[in-house]
Swiss-Prot record:
Cysteine-rich, antigenically variant surface protein. Sequence repeats lie at residues 38-102, 103-167. This is Surface antigen CRP170. Disulfide bonds: none annotated.
Amino acid sequence: TNPSDPTGTCVSAVDCQGSAGYYTDDSVSDAKECKKCNAPCTACAGTADKCTKCDANGAAPYLKKTNPSDPTGTCVSAVDCQGSAGYYTDDSVSDAKECKKCNAPCTACAGTADKCTKCDANGAAPYLKKTNPSDPTGTCVSAVDCQGSAGYYTDDSVSDAKECKKCAEGQKPNTAGTQCFSCSDANCERCDQNDVCARCSTGAPPENGKCPAATPGCHSSCDGCTENAMTNQADKCTGCKEGRYLKPESAAGQSGACLTAEECTSDKTHFTREKAGDSKGMCLSCSDATHGITGCKKCALKTLSGEAESTVVCSECTDKRLTPSGNA
């Protein structure tokens, strides 16, 4: 207990490892020791500076691991963690705080590994897309996915911090999806000049820059719709055209909007599934009673080893802890 005193007591590995701030040193086979971890480690393994836990109330309370398969790391401050490229502070367990690595393609994130604040500018998905203006986090998307999303455009003005931005109120993106123009026509989806429509939400071509009035019938994204649907109502679909997935308005609903796969999965609260029998796709909640996982908040489809079909794997639960297998 006193480093300057060569004497001590003999203990088992269990007793040593169960003592706060101590670890077993087997480096000398016939002179094994139960040694004290170096501060600010409150637990360590192998050597005194290989921390497995840090002082949650100290100046460096976050355990930062550089190798996912190695349970040891170093203790760092919040400033040092957040200043490291691709890392974020995780305070979800108050007495076991961690400095964790962001999920690719995030190059910076906050809160959780998949809440990006910056994307790899040279990667396949370099644009940060936010769905809530007051939330600085979002997902990383490609130029194609951004420009294909209704109301969004790609902003390359900052080369190392590209964004997929939503057009301001009263504006619509151009057909290229690279900038926005004023557009007062409610039935217009794309404007290449101020108040000159280039593509109508009704599916009909514009005449002299204006869209024809909506009529009874299905929106251009629908393959089927409700009886009372109008051609400018994208949320009345009962089936979707190829490449789109029906997202029901409610869990029991039979109608909704037809989204692309990226639009469906962008915030990770939904996943895509082919509807058996007619090859029509569905955009389902992670907690869907039939095909999802009860209590799951965020998920993704993954093909697990030995399985031919993709499986829903949960990454965040609503009110429960996540199991290693990804089942809530």
